[in-house]
Amino acid sequence: MSDQTPAATNGRPPIHVVTRDEFEAVADVIMPVVYPVTIAMALCVALVNILHTPGVESAGTGGMTTAVYAEKASDSASVKLEGAMANAAVFIAFITAATFALFLLFKYRLAKVIWAYMGFSGLLIFGLLGGNILLQVLDKLEIAVDMISVYLFLWNFSVGGALMTFFWPGPLVVKQGYLIFISTIVSYYFTQIPEWTTWTLLVAMALYDLYAVLTPNGPLKMIVELAQERDEDIPALVYESRGPPDAGLRRRRTSARETAESRTSEATSEMSPLIQDRSPASDDGDSRFHLPDSIKLGLGDFIFYSVLVGRAAMYSPITCLCCFTSVLFGLVITLLGLGLYGKALPALPVSIALGTLSFFGARFYLEPFVVDLYAHGIFII
């Protein structure tokens, strides 16, 4: 690929040709985000395949997601839609109130309360929810393990996970692993929500993400701006995608062939979450992509990505694969948008939109087409 950009013609701006070095540099930043999302979704799909009984639809797990309406198979489509929208509205209202409460606690410097709450929640997720899943898996796979060993494992896993995730310093890879486990555990329980409520909730969360991140009065935007003003870390469940220490060095060495002088000023890498503006220090000379060496992604994004793919896995491998690739493609588009525009971007809308369209397209069009081809002995290679 040429390093020359064609001159502007007919009043049009010159076309930027992405070089191989630029492509490799962008891939080095994006892949550390794609890998953990892939692992989280794959684990959720594995749990669904192991524990879900085909043909048996859960009537709901209770709680906030079914506070208004409990879906029944005998209900009409209009009743299911109205009930699902009511459930989604209640859930979004709860999330909005909780986020504003988080903002007020952070504003008045009560971060210790936030950390204490998250630590307690993490302990419950690892110990109770995770323990319940573990017992179900052992029972389903008919694996005999004595209860003392199970309790000792759960004690170490839950207490160690809560401390390493929220309080103790430790290896980044360990914290990343525990965060992936949190997203897997929570997302599996969300897959037990009734179907209509699930899809309505996913769409509602994508719309809420747009409001919370992009609007001036959005709660997430207000929290990020306050954190930037104080130069403090946000007390939240955030996955940091910083890769191995040599990744940034390898990327700089590769790109140094083209922009050695401009790279000199980038010795210090910047961390830029999807809900936070890009630092100007991460610019890469003439490159159109300005992704930093490290990106932070909210754990809620992991959870709802996994819920979508887990729900798709309940129907067929075709729908699951289509949704899986669509969600990852949407995430890559969002990350490229972050690099191109350097603005705060919500991570849910693009992936949820593509994943939802892929699910219904595969379920109602692609899968019947493939089954019909198979029934007639036609194979496309």
Language-model-detected regions and their locations in the chain:
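Multi-pass alpha-helical transmembrane bundle typical of ion/small-solute transporters
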Residues: M1-I381
